């Protein structure tokens, strides 16, 4: 039998062949890393065969490294990977991508970069060299750096002078990716440093409370992350967070919403409630696509007030006609009387913010407000175990996926962002991503039955969150 090394290398070679065959068939090259990003050139990644091959390459390459490298080398790399997000955050805050945009493909010397952002040239150069070693930016000649396909995503498209005068101006509708980087390399990263202390704390380590998290230890406050953001002194954080939540929809194709639950099957005048929907970016996609459906977007008062200008700018007639209503509501209290039966409750990226006791409270209130025709649509990550599960589910859409040996059953590094998200949720509020079994459990405990899981086709941005469809019992 071939060794693991050989099996893994074969998977990579076979997957590369598949990609090149699809590129040849479509008459396009595969995007080169050293080129600046253009979304047109990325289109090939949305090909189903290419997307699947990329997943196999990512999983195989990471497992091949773990197999080939010595254990001490692997542990050393992992233990010191704090430096990558730290350096990424530093480069983002220093507007390096924008400076290099102005420099073009020839790049700029670190001395010239430092003059424009006021940093120490030697230290910033070391930051960029580490990132370039991880294929973020490229060093075209000693101490001369340029953008590549990955780093160019950090470019906010704003003038450097404007960003230096007003750093917060980086985080606007034109630069939604920066909000992910800002939180991932900032607030979430700092909170993660206190994971060990929190896990071993006799109180925090066993608490479901959102104010007993690693984030609380890191930033030394005693309210939940959401309450902390709403304090006047943290208005810039709240603004960035709102943009990040909007980005979770705006950066995804409409298929992430439209190719799941069949909203088109609802009768004219049906009511869809977007629970904790923020400014309503998900409902915006649905309202534009299904003009005969009605929508209510619920969230905390501060976020609900932020939603009004968003709708007035993008679909004012929906507000004016009353087809879309923005309602301030605490989701952990009983649902308000909305004047008509609810056909669909939508929870997108909400349950993962909270521990089970809070999730059960929310689901129970929705069940109490549900009628016999009501559907519950939960749009969340479904975690899988790295091991192969001998049990199979009878729920529609939950058939185990076929993964080639010797890859991990959950595709390992290819889907590692899901497990990183799980740690992020635990770190900033004791929330969590869940497995299928876990969702079946909390839904059944609150009077819901999971009937179907609809998986959205993988695109060049990676697998999209599935839609879990439940009905009252």
Curated annotation (Swiss-Prot):
Cell cycle in keyword set: no
GO biological process: methylation; secondary metabolite biosynthetic process
PROSITE patterns, per the entry: SAM_OMT_II
Top EC category: transferase
Stretch forming the signal peptide: none
Protein name as it appears in the record: O-methyltransferase ARMGADRAFT_1088206
PANTHER family, sorted: O-METHYLTRANSFERASE CICE (PTHR43712:SF2), PUTATIVE (AFU_ORTHOLOGUE AFUA_4G14580)-RELATED (PTHR43712)
Note: Armillaria species are both devastating forest pathogens and some of the largest and oldest terrestrial organisms on Earth. They forage for hosts and achieve immense colony sizes via rhizomorphs, root-like multicellular structures of clonal dispersal. One genetic Armillaria gallica individual localized in Michigan's Upper Peninsula stands out as exceptionally large, covering hundreds of tree root systems over approximately 75 hectares of the forest floor. Based on observed growth rates of the fungus, the minimum age of this large individual can be estimated as 2500 years.
């Amino acid at each position: 039998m071939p060794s693991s090394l050989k099996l893994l290398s074969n998977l990579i070679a076979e997957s590369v062949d598949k990609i090149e065959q699809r590129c040849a068939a479509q008459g396009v090259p595969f995007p080169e890393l050293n080129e600046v990003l253009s979304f047109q050139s990325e289109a090939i990644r949305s090909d189903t065969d290419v997307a699947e091959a990329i997943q196999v390459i990512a999983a195989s390459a990471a497992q091949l490294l773990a197999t080939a490298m010595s254990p001490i080398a692997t542990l050393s790399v992992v233990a010191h990977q704090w430096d990558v997000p730290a350096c990424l955050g530093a480069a983002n805050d220093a507007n390096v991508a924008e400076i290099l945009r102005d420099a073009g493909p020839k790049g700029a010397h670190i001395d010239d970069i430092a003059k424009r952002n006021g940093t120490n040239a030697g230290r910033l150069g070391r930051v960029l060299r580490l990132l370039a070693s991880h294929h973020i930016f490229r060093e075209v000649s000693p101490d001369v750096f340029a953008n590549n396909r990955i780093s160019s995503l950090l470019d906010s498209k704003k003038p450097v002078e404007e960003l230096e005068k007003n750093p917060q101006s980086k985080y606007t509708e034109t630069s939604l990716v920066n909000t992910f980087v800002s939180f991932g390399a900032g607030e979430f990263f700092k909170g993660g440093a206190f994971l060990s202390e929190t896990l071993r704390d006799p109180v925090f380590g066993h608490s479901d409370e959102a104010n007993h998290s690693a984030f609380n230890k890191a930033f030394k406050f005693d309210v939940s992350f959401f309450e902390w953001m709403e304090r006047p002194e943290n208005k810039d954080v709240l603004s960035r967070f709102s943009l990040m939540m909007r980005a979770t929809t705006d950066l995804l194709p409409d298929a992430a919403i439209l190719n799941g639950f069949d909203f088109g099957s609802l009768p004219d005048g049906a009511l869809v409630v977007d629970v904790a929907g923020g400014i309503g970016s998900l409902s915006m996609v649905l309202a534009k696509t299904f003009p005969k459906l009605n929508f209510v977007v619920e969230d905390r008062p501060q976020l609900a007030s932020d939603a009004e200008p968003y709708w007035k700018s993008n679909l004012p007639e929906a507000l004016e006609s009353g087809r879309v209503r923005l309602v301030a509501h605490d989701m952990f209290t009983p649902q308000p009387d909305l004047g008509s039966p609810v056909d669909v409750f939508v929870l997108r990226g909400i349950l993962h913010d909270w521990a089970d006791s809070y999730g059960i409270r929310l689901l129970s209130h929705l069940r109490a407000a549900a009628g016999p025709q009501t559907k519950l649509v939960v749009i969340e990550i479904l975690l899988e175990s790295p091991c192969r599960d001998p049990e199979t589910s009878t729920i529609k859409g939950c058939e185990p996926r076929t993964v080639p040996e010797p890859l991990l059953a959950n595709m390992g590094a290819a889907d590692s962002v899901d497990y990183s998200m799980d740690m992020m949720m635990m770190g900033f509020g004791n929330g969590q991503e869940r497995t299928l079994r876990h969702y079946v459990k909390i839904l059944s405990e609150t009077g819901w039955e999971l009937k179907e899981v609809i998986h959205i086709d993988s695109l060049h941005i990676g697998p999209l969150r599935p839609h879990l469809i439940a009905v009252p019992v």
